[in-house]
UniProtKB/Swiss-Prot annotation:
SUPFAM superfamilies: Concanavalin A-like lectins/glucanases (SSF49899). This is Verrucotoxin subunit beta. It comes from Synanceia verrucosa (Reef stonefish). This lethal (towards mice) toxin induces hemolytic, cytolytic and hypotensive activities. Inhibits calcium channels and may activate ATP-sensitive potassium channels in frog atrial heart muscle. In guinea-pig ventricular myocytes, it modulates calcium channel activity through the beta-adrenoceptor-cAMP-PKA pathway (ADRB). Keywords: Calcium channel impairing toxin, Cytolysis, G-protein coupled receptor impairing toxin, Glycoprotein, Hemolysis, Ion channel impairing toxin, Neurotoxin, Potassium channel impairing toxin, Secreted, Toxin. Residues 506-696 form the B30.2/SPRY domain. Glycosylated. The keyword Glycoprotein applies. One of its GO terms (molecular function) is potassium channel regulator activity. It comes from the Eukaryota. Coiled coil: none annotated. It is found in: Secreted. Gene3D superfamilies: 2.60.120.920.
Length: 696
């Protein structure tokens, strides 16, 4: 090996003939040559070597990238160990997919122009500055350079579903194969079908090349135009070193350091596999960080970000150690067992790739559990607030009389295994507390808690779906509480938490209610049905207010033809409290949908039949309840009211009316007067009749 000529890829490094090179760490030594510039120029032989080719690959592995750039195993190990800083088109080596679930196809254009070499018969007689060689750590000298240029067009899809990666990659590859077929003429165009056009519009392009471009291509169309121009830009003046031939320094200076040995192929393969495995974990972490659910849960986002930083630090430390070992092996100070031991130690550490992937599996499961719950919860259209300060500000809003909050109780940024990884980074010689994450440390690794969380999410959604209440607001948040597994539905009344495991509202007997706040829970917002309104009734304010005035509309089969009445859209599917603001003569109550609409008989008049119950107020008759044509006067403690509450407890079969001077949404605890309690045997709809104005 000490006397072997080396052939290495230039990788964008500024090689010149006669330059010195240290093959032990693959570094150029600028500022020194073996010969004077005049001698080098006189001894240089140049020959033309024109060629061009293109290649398309659908792989992002370091092996395939190295193959495209003709990088041999030893230099590849140096690159992976961080010894080589690449430039120009070789920056393509650093371009890695951001996401694991992402399709990538690369198009390479490669051209060569000429080859320059130094005649080796120069020997030692022309060597200059030999007295400085003792302090110059160079093992080789550059005696040949092949010039040319490389260009890489890297096409990436957006992040896709894991099941579609290969399919999309195949579609991309088929389209990109058409680019080299473009004629080198004035205009560049590729004939694409509409489907292929859609495909090209969905992926991006990144360019790495040895060509100077005024602007780099970012789209498929840009790439076609740029690819067409590359051959015209090629020439000796624009060429850069691509491949370099190196002769050992001992041929010119016997005391020069030598490249004594190199690692075997199996060991170099371990270097590649170990570092690429960490890259795969990092891409997997990027996939998770890009999930919209993670953006909601800052604690999960923090864990993933910390994990990513820890992996980056581990990668940097591992690369630095690999670089030292490679230099020691190539200098003859250590044998390749030094690298073997390094990777054995890595396998016995918490940073073994099996443990890192296991942690990602746990974290992906947590994300999936949270996502499945959020998919259910969002159907309730709650306010999603993961900032506790903002949440309690919302709960203190005077409009929020009642708050139901679905709380994720075990989402935390704390993680025992991340602590182990961090501690091991700081003290790699210490004995780690554990080598891999344990399922018992993660609540979501078992099915019972996630299943319970989904059940509560369905309950929360159903509660929100059933209620149309201006006083009850729905929220979703995350508050860490180890005492409550998974999640809970917390109930707040006027910003005070009352229940931490809410299932359904408890309504006391209507006679026992002493606080109007107990009724506010059932306050609901209904809209009037224009299809049922008598022709002289006009609806406004989003069909929540009605007054008299002729409507110009077509007749409806469902409208009341004789009596000035209107029904609500919503049926009474549970126990709502309807708040009616009144002025003048008002009749309000409940009726069955089957009430007659077209006759002038009592069958069509609210309160005059067995299908309806009504509370009525007129200045002439005062207060009275009406059912089946029977009027019963009602005595109240104060005359006049602004709000009529109609409370139907269908499961209990009761109907109650309340009157008051304040709205039912008012914060005052004063309870309106209960003026009627009747019994119902079936499920009615809301209905009202009026001689003046009515609104809810």
């Amino acid at each position: 090996m000490p006397s072997d000529i080396l052939v290495v890829a230039a990788l964008g490094r500024p090689f010149t003939l006669g330059m010195l090179y240290d093959a032990r760490n693959d570094k150029l030594i600028p500022g020194f040559t073996l010969w004077e510039d005049e001698v080098i120029e006189e001894s240089t032989v140049e020959s033309s070597q024109p060629s061009s080719a293109f290649e398309i690959i659908a792989s992002d592995s370091i092996d395939d990238k190295s193959s495209l750039m003709e990088i041999e195993a030893s230099l590849k190990a140096s690159f992976l160990g961080g010894l080589v800083e690449v430039g120009g088109s070789a920056k393509y080596l650093n371009n890695q997919k951001k996401f694991k679930n992402q399709s990538r196809v690369t198009l390479q254009y490669k051209a060569t122009t000429n080859f320059k070499q130094l005649m080796t018969n120069l020997g030692t007689k022309h060597v200059e500055y030999s007295e400085l060689f003792e302090n110059i750590q160079a093992t080789h000298v550059v005696i040949g350079i092949l010039y040319g240029a490389n260009a890489f067009f890297v096409f990436d899809s957006n992040k896709v579903d894991s099941t579609n990666v290969q399919e999309i990659q195949g579609q991309m590859e088929a389209v990109i194969k058409k680019i080299p077929s473009v004629e080198i003429s004035g205009k560049a165009s590729v004939q694409l079908t509409s489907e292929e056009t859609d495909i090209t519009n969905s992926f991006s392009c990144e360019f790495h090349g040895d060509f100077f471009l005024t602007s780099n291509p970012t789209t498929f169309e840009d790439a076609v135009k740029t690819y067409q121009q590359l051959p015209q830009m090629m020439g000796k003046d624009n060429a850069v070193p691509m491949t370099v031939w190196l002769v050992p320094m001992v041929n010119f200076y016997s005391e020069a350091p030598q490249l004594m040995a190199d690692s075997s192929t199996p060991i170099l393969r371990k270097v590649r596999n170990t570092l690429e495995a960490i890259v795969q974990v990092q891409m997997r972490c990027n996939d998770a960080l890009d999930d919209p659910t993670v953006n909601l849960f800052t604690e999960v986002q923090k864990k993933l970000s910390d994990f990513q930083i820890i992996c980056d630090d581990h990668m940097s430390k591992l690369q630095a150690t690999i670089a030292k070992k490679l230099f020691a092996i190539r200098s003859g100070d250590e044998d390749e067992s030094a690298l073997v031991n390094l990777f054995e130690e890595n396998l016995q550490s918490p940073f073994n790739t099996e443990s890192l992937n296991m942690w990602m599996e746990f974290e992906e499961r947590e994300i999936n559990v949270l996502k499945s719950c959020m998919d259910i919860l969002t159907k309730a259209k709650p306010k999603v607030i993961f900032n506790q300060g903002v949440l309690f500000k919302e709960l203190y809003d005077s409009k929020v009389k009642h708050g139901l909050c679905y709380v994720f109780t075990n989402v935390t940024k704390n993680d025992d295994f991340l602590t182990v990884l961090n501690d091991f980074l700081d003290s790699p010689q210490s004995r780690p507390k554990k080598l891999r994450p344990s399922p018992k440390d993660y609540w979501y690794s078992y099915d019972d808690i996630p299943e319970m969380m989904r059940e509560k999410a369905h309950l929360f959604r159903n509660l929100a779906k059933e209620m149309n209440n201006r006083c009850v607001h729905f929220f979703v948040t995350a508050i860490n509480n180890p005492k409550q597994e998974g999640a809970g539905i917390h109930y707040y009344r006027e910003s005070i938490q009352i229940i931490h495991e809410f299932t359904k509202p408890h309504m006391p007997g209507v006679e026992t209610i002493k606080d109007r706040r107990e009724l506010q829970w059932y306050d609901c917002e209904l809209t009037l049905d224009t299809e049922t309104a008598h022709q002289v009734l006009t609806l406004s304010e989003g069909n929540k207010r009605q007054c008299r005035g002729v409507r110009v509309t077509r007749r409806s089969l469902r409208e009341f033809s004789h009596f000035q009445q209107v029904m609500c859209h919503q049926g009474a599917e549970w126990t709502p409290l309807l708040g009616v603001r009144v002025a003048g003569h008002v009749s309000a109550g409940v009726t069955y949908k089957g009430i007659s609409r077209k006759t002038s008989t009592p069958d069509s008049s609210l309160g005059k039949n067995q299908k309806s119950w009504v509370f009525e107020y007129t200045k002439k008759s005062g207060y009275q309840q009406i059912h089946n044509g029977k009027n019963a006067r009602v005595t109240v403690s104060s005359i006049g009211f602004k709000q009529l509450g109609v409370y139907l407890d269908w499961p209990a079969g009761t109907l109650s009316f309340y009157i008051g001077q304040q709205s039912l949404g008012d914060s005052s605890p004063h309870l309106p007067h209960q003026i009627l309690r009747g019994c119902l045997s079936s499920l009615p709809d809301w209905g009202c009749t009026t001689e003046s104005q009515w609104s809810n």
